[in-house]
């Protein structure tokens, strides 16, 4: 597997409007799914009717999304398009994948990961806005086996890829390849991390519809 970039790979995978709809379903916005990339902690009051007290209130979440880079995990079934694409990835590579939604509404804030590498391959699709995406040559002798790789690392040399991603564009970043995403405008993207080992553990990709 090598780094790759394709224009207009999947137009209309996911939109601001679809994301807005999900954000307003408070039970989905748990602290296990929502990651605000800063070092602060937050407290809030809950309605007596709330079943899960660890869900971000929409007013707080809106404020944080306007100021910080955030990402959301376990999102591979949130729309039919994302679910279908995750199924395609799993069938192609014979491995399980998730979908992580990344959002940056404030292009002036530095990406907290900086230049970093991951321990699994990622297919990243730009959904809204523009991103300058760079990928450098593979790092050898990586000893990490678990976790999320390393962030804010130093690399030398010219990047293998240095592209402006527009809605529908795709970049494939294999494991151990340093990369950096710089938001040019407010942007929304979906990353599909692919597990390293082949296995039969799959999300149920059935999509039901009510008839009539």
Question: Predicted regions span which residues?
Answer:
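N-terminal low-complexity, Ser/Thr- and acidic-residue-enriched intrinsically disordered segments
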Residues: 1-3
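Active-site region of the double-stranded beta-helix
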Residues: 12, 20, 24-167, 177-211
């Amino acid at each position: 597997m090598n780094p790759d970039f394709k224009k207009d790979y999947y137009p209309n995978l996911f939109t601001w409007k679809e994301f807005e709809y999900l954000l307003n379903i408070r039970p989905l916005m748990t602290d296990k799914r929502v990651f605000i990339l800063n070092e602060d902690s937050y407290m809030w009051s809950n309605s007596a009717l709330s079943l899960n007290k660890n869900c971000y209130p929409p007013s707080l979440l809106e404020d944080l999304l306007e100021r910080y880079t955030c990402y959301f995990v376990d999102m591979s079934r949130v729309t039919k398009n994302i679910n279908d694409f995750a199924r395609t990835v799993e069938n192609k590579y014979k491995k399980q994948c998730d979908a992580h939604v990344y959002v940056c509404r404030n292009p002036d804030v530095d990406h907290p990961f900086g230049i970093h590498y991951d321990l699994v391959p990622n297919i990243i699709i730009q959904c809204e806005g523009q991103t300058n995406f760079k990928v450098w040559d593979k790092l050898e002798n990586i000893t990490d086996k678990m976790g999320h790789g390393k962030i804010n690392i130093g690399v030398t040399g010219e990047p293998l890829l240095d592209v402006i991603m527009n809605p529908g564009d795709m970049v494939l970043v294999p494991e151990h390849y340093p990369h950096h995403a710089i938001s040019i405008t407010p942007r929304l993207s979906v990353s599909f991390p692919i597990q390293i080992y082949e296995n039969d553990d799959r999300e149920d990709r059935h999509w039901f519809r009510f008839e009539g």
